[in-house]
């Protein structure tokens, strides 16, 4: 089944609001807890995000089996019930990414977030070929995630965009201002631009000036109303509100996040536990916050619920 949106319609819809990247729930035995995941999606989708990205980085894609990815995507499509577009992941090598994109289309997802190739070195031309092959394997709109080894420059990205009408967006997880400026200067409104650095609220205001109108909010998982309010302040360029919340909440939160590799996901599940919506442990190779560390996000969240 094809998406309810054309790629250009999808880009317009996603770029107009905040993006939800839900965690994936696991039980004490580390099995995918689909009932808890579905219940949480019901709660999240009651808040007006512009789109939901199932089984993404915050959702521990790297720790899921392909069957679990399919189940997570189908659950997201069912539970959101058309209230917002659902974007499914594709990743690993090109053949697997193509299969994942085609599975997402069968599972009625509305678009694809294409993650970097797995465990290999590659240049911009190789990444461009990878993206093009995935785009041509599906009718769904595709957002390419620039991160790790997936480093497309403006020339390579423009070439793929010309060849693939369904390449609808670029998510930046690199943080190279020169690269992002050149990409937006060359491609302009041809693509949707998504902020994808960890704790994207930190960079939301400067990225807005580079054409990045939305971002993936992990904090939305446990403070959706706060996250929507902060996003509104960013779009309004309300510097006073933005820097107050950065100083009082976001930047102290990132200090704990940076304490250990992988805590960018672990701290989100800690935040969910702190607000009474536990999602279970993270899967290895990630590690959960210690009990002593858990007190810190609880204190930071405070009255922001």
Swiss-Prot record:
Stored SUPFAM superfamilies: Aldolase
UniProt xrefs under InterPro entries: Aldolase_TIM, DapA-like, Dehydro-deoxyglucarate_dehyd
Record Pfam families: DHDPS
Documented EC number(s): 4.2.1.41
Lyase as UniProt keyword: yes
Catalytic activity line of the entry: 5-dehydro-4-deoxy-D-glucarate + H(+) = 2,5-dioxopentanoate + CO2 + H2O
Disulphide bridges, residue numbers: none
Listed GO MF terms: 4-hydroxy-tetrahydrodipicolinate synthase activity; 5-dehydro-4-deoxyglucarate dehydratase activity
Broad enzyme group: lyase
A biological process from GO: D-glucarate catabolic process
Keywords annotated in UniProt: Lyase
Pathway annotation from the record: Carbohydrate acid metabolism; D-glucarate degradation; 2,5-dioxopentanoate from D-glucarate: step 2/2
NCBIfam families named in the record: KdgD, PRK03620.1
Annotated family: Belongs to the DapA family.
Protein name per the record: Probable 5-dehydro-4-deoxyglucarate dehydratase
Species annotation: Xanthomonas campestris pv. campestris (strain 8004)
